[in-house]
Amino acid sequence: MYQHNTEKFGSFERHIFSNPSSKNSFSIVPECGAVLIDTFFAGINVIDGFSMPEELESFKWAKSAVLYPFPNRMCDGAYTHDGNTYNFPVDNAATNNAIHGFGKKMPHQIVSMILSENYAAVTCRNDYDGYLPYYPFPCCFEITFTISDDNKMTIGMSLKNTGENTIPTAIGWHPYFAISEKIEDTLLQLPDLQLIEVNERMLPTGKKENYNRFSSLEKINETSLDNGFFYPKSRKKCRSHFTI
């Protein structure tokens, strides 16, 4: 049977969902971006999250952050919508970009919870009223974490426009996985994708190229990946596989 417990995590409260029998569990901090701290299957953690409260306070590397109202980088923090120009704060000094939106540190509330024999699910919500001058668009973001005894974790996200006008938005998630001691020995398999080209400021150039590396399970070795990928809508499922 899954259980729900809480404990102090620095100035935050950590919510732990666990099944002592299967040793499956995960923990989140709703009041700081509903960030996922860890995920255990059979007692083995597969998420490289913020292990200490001090790390969460700094939010370095945005580990397991929810990304909204934009998931990537914004050139000079500026964007135009319906003829109006807005400027997000530049929070990535190295590239002079705004990065990952503001959702990653927004307070979220638990709005539903299921604890059963074989799985646990929790939904967190942030009702944003549009108070920031650089994003004056009310919206509601929800994220649901579900863990089950068949060693699966499912994460579902949605963002609903709660205002009267159209809004510019996109969402994403920023996980770091716990891997073997040497990343070179980690095995990776990807579906057929298109790699999104970026410039020296890590901004998309608008170009894409087919990426067929790792079409079968193979070692990462010296491969460096710091790009986004495009997956055609015509395909119903996108699944990646890695072995640690």
Map each language-model feature to its residues:
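Beta-strand-rich N-terminal accessory domains
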Residues: M1-F88, N92, F242-I244
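Residues that act as N-cap/strand-start positions at coil-to-secondary-structure junctions
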Residues: F9-S11, S22, G33, R73, ...
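Broad, structure-driven detector of short, well-ordered beta-strand segments within folded domains
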Residues: N24-I28, I143-F145, L188
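Active-site/ligand-binding surface loops and adjacent short beta/alpha elements
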Residues: N87-F88, A93, T166-I167, Y176-I244
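Acidic, contiguous internal or C-terminal segments within carbohydrate-active enzymes
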Residues: F17-N19, P30, N126-T169, W173-P175, ...
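Extended, loop-rich substrate-binding clefts of extracytoplasmic carbohydrate-active enzymes
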Residues: M1-F9, N84, P89-D149
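Intrinsic-disorder/low-complexity, polar/charged segments enriched in Ser/Thr/Lys/Arg/Asp/Glu/Gln
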Residues: K23-S25, Y119-T123, C140-E142, K152-T154, ...
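Glycine-rich, pocket-lining loop/helix-strand segments that form or immediately flank
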Residues: N45-W61, N84-P107, Q189-N210
